[in-house]
Amino acid sequence: MGRIIGIDLGTTNSCVSIMEGNTPRVIENSEGARTTPSIVAYQEDGEVLVGASAKRQAVTNAKNTLYAIKRLIGRKFTEKEVQKDINLMPYKIAAADNGDAWVEVRGKQISAQQVSADILRKMKKTAEDYLGEPVTEAVITVPAYFNDAQRQATKDAGRIAGLEVKRIINEPTAAALAFGLDKQEKGDRKIAVYDLGGGTFDISIIEIADVDGEKQFEVLSTNGDTFLGGEDFDQRIIDYIIAEFKKEQGVDLSKDVLALQRLKEAAEKAKIELSNSAQTDINLPYITADASGPKHLNIKLSRAKLEALVEELLERTLAPCRTAIKDAGVSVGDIHDVILVGGQTRMPKVQEMVKALFGKEPRKDVNPDEAVAVGAAIQGQVLSGDRTDVLLLDVTPLSLGIETMGGVMTKMIKKNTTIPTKFAQTFSTAEDNQPAVTIKVFQGEREIASGNKALGEFNLEGIPPAARGTPQIEVSFDIDANGILHVGAKDKGTGKENKITIKANSGLSEAEIQQMVKDAELHSADDKKKVEFVQAKNNAEAMVHSVRKSLGEYGDKLEVGEKEKIETAIKDMEEALKGDDKDAIEAKNTALMEASQKLGEKMYADMQSSQAAGAEAAAGGAGAEQAHAKPADDNVVDAEVKEVKKG
């Protein structure tokens, strides 16, 4: 069995980790960074850039550079959160045939799952480069408050990326694993994980207990907001800058895609700077131009102003915290430790607010950017059987139920129920001689079904004619360890049954996923070809440079025919380099190597004779040098001497 990697698939940044023995290791990507921006750019020539390279070209390719895609995954186009993002994002969000929110790049619609798969593929490659072996299995994290559709969509993204997703694990739970595993305190400890990331907010109350030498992590409650995070904080700064610039210059930057992309970068930078300083300058020369000429933007932003701009966003995190504490059946005083996760928690005001709410200083010994990936890697080690001293008991974040008479939501599994879990209840028909029942499945806390998230529906047919209330229909709910729901209905009288795995009333079909997996494999093959072509081209260009240089130095020692042969081979090679045929380039490279063989022989012979002459001169001059040797302080050369320590 290969290694199971842990991936934190974040809204703003992603991170990958593995276990080396019992020590977690966060893996640096090809740029040497421990986190990778969750940004994907689609180039005109079909190349896909992921991470820092995609971020660098965002200003000049805004419409085809996708970020914060996690906010769309598993969502319908008509959802109010998606509609809000349509007006804010420089890229186009479109409705897919199944009603999902997809994106449009270079005239082609692609799903949020495919974009997420590109990010996951980069994480997979990062791990493979480090381990030197293929990676096929992963534990991927999601916000605790993700619903069933969002979890399923994340799992699908993993499959498209060529990963078997062994487990979907909640981000706060993963962070608790990373925090609690090496703690030696005896007795049960209750911790609160406050997770404010790039696009989502979660709060979980978790109990860590020692049970016969085994660390047990039991989630008591969870709550949150899947559309609240650092991206919203950035947007508040952007809106403020736009308003200020309009006041000063009379120009509205909100319609300028290029300017917006520069503003986004500047807003994120300013926000980070204000975590360490009281004031920052936002300086963007040539931000736009009008009839009077170019316009420059220079605005001062203080920490106090930023706090005022985002006050309402910070307030929005408090209600879920209070609900989670209440649902866990604990008081604030019962909580031993508060852990901060997610880059946005570096903001001093967030830390102040959390301290005020929980009455204690948040822990500083948890890396908010890496803890989630580390926890996922620990869970991967547990699932692979390499670790047996950890037990994780997670919960379902929202209640699950079915629609019954009058549009009422009848809850089958209540929120914060430990998973995996099963529950069955018997229902009957609403009308005489009813031949079939439609089971409509919902997720949420509202009493009326239509106010909750519709997850899917199916029919149980062939019910024998009978008076209303007579048939006995058993509906069963089964949530697996990934938090994904399977629903069944059975007519107790006839034994007829029907089952579905909830894939939301949209999501990707199996055929679509298979097609996307194939496309991804093709893409991978294309990428490999591209890399091979670039390598062949680089080798050829280096060869041309080297031969040309040698020809300049030793060409006069060659016969005319030999020299012409080399020059012809160089011309042929330069012609081949103008095209994109790898085989032709390699063939011309071989021809050039053969043609320049005589040149190499001349160079070698010349070097040999030079060395021999040098050796003779050195031997002849040694005696004379010794005879004249005497101290000559005025000829001393100052030099730096370094001690080379061995071992």
Swiss-Prot record:
Residues 607-647 are annotated as: Disordered. GO terms for molecular function: ATP binding; ATP-dependent protein folding chaperone; unfolded protein binding. The modification Phosphothreonine is found at residue 200. Keywords: ATP-binding, Chaperone, Nucleotide-binding, Phosphoprotein, Stress response. Induction: By stress conditions e.g. heat shock. Residues 627-647 have a biased composition (Basic and acidic residues). Gene3D superfamilies: 1.20.1270.10, 3.30.420.40, Actin, Chain A, domain 4 (3.90.640.10), Substrate Binding Domain Of DNAk, Chain A, domain 1 (2.60.34.10). InterPro entries: ATPase_NBD, Chaperone_DnaK, Heat_shock_70_CS, HSP70_C_sf, HSP70_peptide-bd_sf, Hsp_70_fam. The keyword Ribosomal protein does not apply. NCBIfam families: PRK00290.1, PRK05183.1, prok_dnaK. Acts as a chaperone. Belongs to the heat shock protein 70 family. This is Chaperone protein DnaK.
